[in-house]
């Protein structure tokens, strides 16, 4: 199962963080567009008339360092296949939230 609809919160929850192809979501308003994959990564640009100008290209990683052990990891991407207790993405109207928990630390990363 890749995910499910959460009727109470009116969002789709992606549970499979290693799908065959990326899940893409587009967030926008009158001036800007943001593309997000299941990790919160993607492109952002602003519209200027019929032109667009890139604001951000591709990577929005959140890194965490454990000061006791020196371990550094990406809370939203999990490049090292660490045994996260929670690693999921909540996709709602005008936001996308990546939630992860590893070694007792919960990180919530929201793009809106």
Protein language model annotation of sequence segments:
Residues 1-112:
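Anionic coordination/interaction segments
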